[in-house]
């Protein structure tokens, strides 16, 4: 088996290429062969290269068109979103205004209701005061009447004897009899 390092060691034994310079031997440099190969490559590779470039150009143009379409779609969506936003803002403002007017209306209703309730309470208070005054007046009248009656009975009992008592009863019976005859 050969040693792997043998080819590298053999490099040290190669002779040097000499000095650097231009080789003017046309057959040694082979420019004719190179120009023929380049000409064939250009002639036959021109179509392939132009097809590759055309395909690349078409893909780039298609990508640009797609990007433009996407941009226009995004702009349309943005405009729709802005339109919806304006609409929602208008509705929100309208709800806000309606809410404030509803609050004011409820406030006025509450004030009116409260004032009516206060008025009713004032009327109830006045009626209660009037009722209590009438009751107090009636109590005073009853006491005065009772005291007057007691005083009159006391006076009558002290001044009245049997004879006067019988005469008063007879007079009253006579008056009732006269009244009965008048009504018949």
UniProtKB/Swiss-Prot annotation:
Primary location class: plastid
Subcellular location: Plastid, Chloroplast thylakoid membrane
Pfam families per UniProt: ATP-synt_B
Keyword Signal part of the UniProt annotation: no
Matching InterPro entries: ATP_synth_b/b'su_bac/chlpt
A GO cellular component annotation in the UniProt record: proton-transporting ATP synthase complex
GO function terms (MF aspect): proton-transporting ATP synthase activity, rotational mechanism
Cysteine-cysteine disulfides: none
The organism's place on the tree of life at top rank: Eukaryota
Record keywords: ATP synthesis, CF(0), Chloroplast, Hydrogen ion transport, Ion transport, Membrane, Plastid, Thylakoid, Transmembrane, Transmembrane helix, Transport
Membrane topology per record: Single-pass membrane protein
Parts of the chain that traverse the membrane: 27-49
Subunit structure: F-type ATPases have 2 components, F(1) - the catalytic core - and F(0) - the membrane proton channel. F(1) has five subunits: alpha(3), beta(3), gamma(1), delta(1), epsilon(1). F(0) has four main subunits: a(1), b(1), b'(1) and c(10-14). The alpha and beta chains form an alternating ring which encloses part of the gamma chain. F(1) is attached to F(0) by a central stalk formed by the gamma and epsilon chains, while a peripheral stalk is formed by the delta, b and b' chains.
Function of the protein: F(1)F(0) ATP synthase produces ATP from ADP in the presence of a proton or sodium gradient. F-type ATPases consist of two structural domains, F(1) containing the extramembraneous catalytic core and F(0) containing the membrane proton channel, linked together by a central stalk and a peripheral stalk. During catalysis, ATP synthesis in the catalytic domain of F(1) is coupled via a rotary mechanism of the central stalk subunits to proton translocation.
Miscellaneous remark of the record: In plastids the F-type ATPase is also known as CF(1)CF(0).
Recorded family membership: Belongs to the ATPase B chain family.
Name of the protein described by the UniProt record: ATP synthase subunit b, chloroplastic
Gene (UniProt): atpF
């Amino acid at each position: 088996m050969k040693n792997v390092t043998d080819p590298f060691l053999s490099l040290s034994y190669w002779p040097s290429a000499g000095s650097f310079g231009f080789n003017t031997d046309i057959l040694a440099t082979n420019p004719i062969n190179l120009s023929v190969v380049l000409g064939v490559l250009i002639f036959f590779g021109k179509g392939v290269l132009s097809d590759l470039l055309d395909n690349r150009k078409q893909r780039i143009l298609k990508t640009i068109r797609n990007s433009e379409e996407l941009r226009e779609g995004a702009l349309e969506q943005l405009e729709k979103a802005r339109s919806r936003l304006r609409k929602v803002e208008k509705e929100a403002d309208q709800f806000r205004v309606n809410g404030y007017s509803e609050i004011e209306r409820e406030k006025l209703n509450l004030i009116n209701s409260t004032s009516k309730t206060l008025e009713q309470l004032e009327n109830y208070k006045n009626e209660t005061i009037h009722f209590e005054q009438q009751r107090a007046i009636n109590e005073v009248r009853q006491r005065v009447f009772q005291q007057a009656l007691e005083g009159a009975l006391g006076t009558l009992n002290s001044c009245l004897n049997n004879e006067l008592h019988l005469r008063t009863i007879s007079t009253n019976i006579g008056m009732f009899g006269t009244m009965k005859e008048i009504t018949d």
